[in-house]
Amino acid sequence: MRVAGIIVEYNPFHNGHLYHLQKTREITNADIVVGVMSGNFIQRGEPAIVNKWARTKMAILNGVDVIFELPFAYACNSAEIFAYGAISILNQLGVDFIVFGSECGDIDKLKETAKHLAFEEDDFKSSLKSYLKEGYSFPKARELALIKTCKTNIEFSSNNILGIEYIKWIYRLNSKIEPFTIRRIGASYNDPNLTQDTYASATAIRRNINNLHAIKNKMPSVSYEILLEEFESGRGPVILEDYFKLFIYNAIVVPDFLKNKIDVKEGLENRFEKYIFNSPSAKNLLENVKTKRYTLTRLQRIFIHAIVRNNFDQKALLSITPYVRVLGFNYKGKEYLNKIKDKIEYITKLNQQWLKNPQYKELLELEIRSSMLHALQYKDFHKYLQTEFKSSPIYISSRS
């Protein structure tokens, strides 16, 4: 059985994602495609516009055979930690291939750059340290160090960076996964504008989420219908601004609310304190706090980690093995799960037994807490606060 893995967020599932899925099957000739998907919060430090169960349903109905969860601690984090979590899960599953989108579309260039990161040499480390001292953000400092010491000419754009991180962790974990990349088509990852093209970025779709007619042709019909159902049921769209008052509340009642929180360094908490009580919105606050080193995306993650009360040791995340949890599957996925169940332990129904497992306890507690915070924004929020314990994987039995 040939198994291909993809790493996704599906926020929401759009035409570009369908193209990626189709090309994955075409390139690898895979019998099964499994996805590792972010839960209720995504890598950019934002809540997913609809919950992970709705997005899992989109994925399965559009042809992904199994969706596994990328735990919150990894999903809402830097590219390095995000990639480690996802590759670690795919490696546990023993997939044969990974296929990801990139701006360059050249796997050899990405591999070469990833090798320099996987096996850091002294001149690279020295250059990185120097650029960090100059006040650059870590991603920018690393980019400059690579250009200087490795003579790489690759563009350090969003998907290229993630692709490099995926390959880096394949090398570091001594994984047998074979990586492939496809060139992104249509709008760039961060393009906020809708065009006549049927391929739009997820960013553009989210920005125009209140104009459902405008985004209808940018998504497969089944994705659009699920999105509409979630909105009509009061379970979305969930956005970062929904949490601004909660953030302020914490700043009021918790002394030194941000001190010693994840990624809060060099007196960053003082910049937050300077602006927090004079800012009309989360967007305004974060724009004011932003510096050359602290990018908007990084600040959004700090914002989310603070309200979720995430104190997980970030270095430890790169040395532990994340749990494997099934969110949904189809009839082919069911056969695959039955085939691997004797080789790997995976979660289908979350219960107290899993929470007592010291290996996964903290990761699962964070997942539960983040999901409850997501549910707080729903119309009938009280019905969904215990969803993590009530939900079983979504099963789509149709063979059509």
Swiss-Prot record:
Role of this protein: Catalyzes the formation of N(4)-acetylcytidine (ac(4)C) at the wobble position of elongator tRNA(Met), using acetate and ATP as substrates. First activates an acetate ion to form acetyladenylate (Ac-AMP) and then transfers the acetyl group to tRNA to form ac(4)C34.
Gene Ontology MF terms: ATP binding; ligase activity, forming carbon-nitrogen bonds; tRNA binding
Descriptive protein name: tRNA(Met) cytidine acetate ligase
Class of enzymatic activity (EC top level): ligase
EC annotation from Swiss-Prot or TrEMBL: 6.3.4.-
GO biological process annotation, one example: tRNA modification
Record SUPFAM superfamilies: Nucleotidylyl transferase
Superkingdom: Bacteria
Keywords: ATP-binding, Cytoplasm, Ligase, Nucleotide-binding, RNA-binding, tRNA processing, tRNA-binding
Cellular component terms per the entry's GO annotation: cytoplasm
Binding site for ATP: 7-20, 101, 159, 184-185
Gene coding for it: tmcAL
Keyword Transmembrane on entry: no
Organism expressing this protein natively: Caldicellulosiruptor bescii (strain ATCC BAA-1888 / DSM 6725 / KCTC 15123 / Z-1320) (Anaerocellum thermophilum)
Keyword GTP-binding: no
Annotated family: Belongs to the TmcAL family.
Catalytic activity: cytidine(34) in elongator tRNA(Met) + acetate + ATP = N(4)-acetylcytidine(34) in elongator tRNA(Met) + AMP + diphosphate
Subcellular location: Cytoplasm
Alphabetized Pfam families for the sequence: HIGH_NTase1
